């Protein structure tokens, strides 16, 4: 291992928690690396790029896409090394206390400390279990909604009864020509206010009903009709549609901690059992964002920022025990003086 290969902090995950960890780690003058499974930074927010996010203090309502842009810009402030399209499969520790992060392709990354910021894990949408459905994914079978404009003046059917399905039904109802929602159970399981909004809208809901067949048009490239089956009566009906959205939840890949030799305490078969300081049961390994669980945990993007700051502060003291417990606030920090002067010049133009 070359000295250049060893990092002070390696952040696994490039979502909000990971990006803020990288920013704050740079602020505390640590050599930092981000490793992200996806081909881009931003995390799960990519699933809802056009949704408005209201609950970040001091920040006016912002779209997911804009928030990603700002988070990435901030996260790269101190030029951390960024590794994309890379899956960390295990973490081990040598006799000198250095962590080795092994990837699915056999590469190794070396770090003095690790911050796990993998959110809800590597998420893959649960696909529609109908033979041949995958061929329509290039036309009008959707597992995410990346652009509301796509559904303008279209007849849309959404399959699912959780928060995501209900949210998209409410978002699309004033935009689409017609919105249908089909759910295999008798009652929707989303937030009460969202369910009430949906039931009072023009959207039409089919309960105890599932999509059982996709019927293509004459060109065989896109779905033209869906066949719905009522599980109570056995009745089968056809519905003409333009777009199909499937919200059946996500399959979670949790192999990272399962494959690791470290004895990291886990809660609910996935989450890292930590504390309010973002510490795990393993010295030098920290957690931030949704992957971290402890009493009083705030499961919001805003909470992820606090987790990240706590994790970085603990990492700094782990590496340098006599370091300050907290980093200096940005308004008085020397590293921003030059940047502040440049920003003030721009403001004065």
Swiss-Prot record:
<protein>
    <recommendedName>
        <fullName>Ferredoxin--NADP reductase 1</fullName>
        <ecNumber>1.18.1.2</ecNumber>
    </recommendedName>
</protein>
<dbReference type="Pfam" id="PF07992">
    <property type="entry name" value="Pyr_redox_2"/>
</dbReference>
<feature type="binding site">
    <location>
        <position position="290"/>
    </location>
    <ligand>
        <name>FAD</name>
    </ligand>
</feature>
<feature type="binding site">
    <location>
        <position position="44"/>
    </location>
    <ligand>
        <name>FAD</name>
    </ligand>
</feature>
<keyword id="KW-0274">FAD</keyword>
<feature type="binding site">
    <location>
        <position position="123"/>
    </location>
    <ligand>
        <name>FAD</name>
    </ligand>
</feature>
<keyword id="KW-0285">Flavoprotein</keyword>
<comment type="similarity">
    <text>Belongs to the ferredoxin--NADP reductase type 2 family.</text>
</comment>
<feature type="binding site">
    <location>
        <position position="48"/>
    </location>
    <ligand>
        <name>FAD</name>
    </ligand>
</feature>
<dbReference type="GO" id="GO:0004324">
    <property type="term" value="F:ferredoxin-NADP+ reductase activity"/>
</dbReference>
<keyword id="KW-0560">Oxidoreductase</keyword>
<dbReference type="InterPro" id="IPR050097">
    <property type="entry name" value="Ferredoxin-NADP_redctase_2"/>
</dbReference>
<dbReference type="InterPro" id="IPR036188">
    <property type="entry name" value="FAD/NAD-bd_sf"/>
</dbReference>
<feature type="binding site">
    <location>
        <position position="36"/>
    </location>
    <ligand>
        <name>FAD</name>
    </ligand>
</feature>
<dbReference type="GO" id="GO:0050661">
    <property type="term" value="F:NADP binding"/>
</dbReference>
<comment type="subunit">
    <text>Homodimer.</text>
</comment>
<keyword id="KW-0521">NADP</keyword>
<dbReference type="InterPro" id="IPR022890">
    <property type="entry name" value="Fd--NADP_Rdtase_type_2"/>
</dbReference>
<dbReference type="InterPro" id="IPR023753">
    <property type="entry name" value="FAD/NAD-binding_dom"/>
</dbReference>
<dbReference type="GO" id="GO:0050660">
    <property type="term" value="F:flavin adenine dinucleotide binding"/>
</dbReference>
<feature type="binding site">
    <location>
        <position position="88"/>
    </location>
    <ligand>
        <name>FAD</name>
    </ligand>
</feature>
<feature type="binding site">
    <location>
        <position position="331"/>
    </location>
    <ligand>
        <name>FAD</name>
    </ligand>
</feature>
């Amino acid at each position: 291992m070359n000295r250049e290969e060893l990092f002070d902090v390696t952040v696994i995950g490039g979502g909000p928690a990971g990006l803020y960890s990288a920013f704050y780690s740079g602020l505390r003058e640590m050599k930092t690396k981000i490793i992200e499974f996806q081909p881009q930074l931003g995390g799960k927010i990519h699933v809802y790029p056009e949704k408005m996010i209201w609950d970040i203090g001091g920040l006016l309502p912002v779209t997911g896409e804009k928030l990603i842009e700002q988070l990435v810009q901030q996260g790269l402030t101190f030029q951390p090394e960024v590794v994309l399209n890379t899956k960390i499969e295990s973490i081990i520790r040598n006799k000198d206390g250095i962590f080795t992060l092994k990837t699915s392709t056999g590469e190794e990354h070396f770090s003095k400390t690790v911050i796990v910021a993998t959110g809800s894990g590597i998420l893959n949408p649960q696909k529609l279990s109908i033979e041949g459905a995958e061929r329509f994914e290039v036309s009008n079978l959707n597992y995410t909604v990346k652009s509301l404009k796509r559904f303008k003046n279209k007849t849309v059917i959404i399959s699912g009864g959780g928060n995501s399905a209900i949210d998209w039904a409410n978002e699309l109802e004033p935009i689409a020509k017609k919105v249908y929602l089909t759910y295999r159970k008798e009652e929707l399981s989303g937030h009460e206010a969202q369910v009430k909004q949906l039931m009072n809208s023009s959207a039409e809901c089919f309960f105890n009903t599932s999509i059982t067949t996709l019927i293509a048009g004459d060109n065989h490239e896109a779905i033209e009709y869906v066949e719905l089956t009522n599980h109570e009566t056995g009745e089968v009906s056809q519905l003409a549609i333009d777009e199909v959205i499937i919200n059946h939840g996500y399959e979670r890949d949790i192999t990272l901690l399962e494959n690791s030799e470290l004895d990291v305490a886990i809660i609910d078969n996935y989450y890292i059992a930590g504390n309010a300081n973002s510490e795990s049961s393993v010295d030098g390994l920290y957690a931030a964002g949704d992957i971290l669980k402890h009493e009083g945990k705030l499961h919001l993007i805003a909470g992820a920022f606090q987790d990240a700051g706590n994790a970085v502060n603990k990492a700094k003291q782990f590496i340098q025990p006599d370091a300050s417990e907290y980093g200096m606030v940005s308004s008085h920090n020397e590293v921003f003086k030059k940047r502040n002067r440049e920003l003030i010049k721009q403001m004065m133009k």
